[in-house]
Amino acid sequence: MAVPKKRTSKAKKNSRKANWKRKAAKSAQKSLSLAKSILRGKTTSFVYRLYVDE
């Protein structure tokens, strides 16, 4: 079984965590922005159907 030989430093751990959080925040901001533009009807980069055909 693979086991890490040495302990990861706090700086490296914090750097990785900050990067992960930055990516998550960017993704959340993007989705919120898209939702707002869809609600306002000003979307240009997203294709969707207004009415569902049954």
Curated annotation (Swiss-Prot):
Start-end of Basic residues biased regions: 1-25
GO CC terms, sorted: chloroplast; large ribosomal subunit
Keyword set, alphabetical order: Chloroplast, Plastid, Ribonucleoprotein, Ribosomal protein
GO MF terms, alphabetically ordered: structural constituent of ribosome
Region entry Disordered, spans: 1-26
Keyword Ribosomal protein: yes
Transmembrane residue ranges: none
BP GO annotations: translation
Location within or outside the cell: Plastid, Chloroplast
One Pfam family recorded for the sequence: Ribosomal_L32p
InterPro entries per record: Ribosomal_bL32 (IPR002677), Ribosomal_bL32_plant/cyanobact (IPR044958), Ribosomal_zn-bd (IPR011332)
Record-stated family: Belongs to the bacterial ribosomal protein bL32 family.
Protein name listed in UniProt: Large ribosomal subunit protein bL32c
Underlying gene: rpl32-A
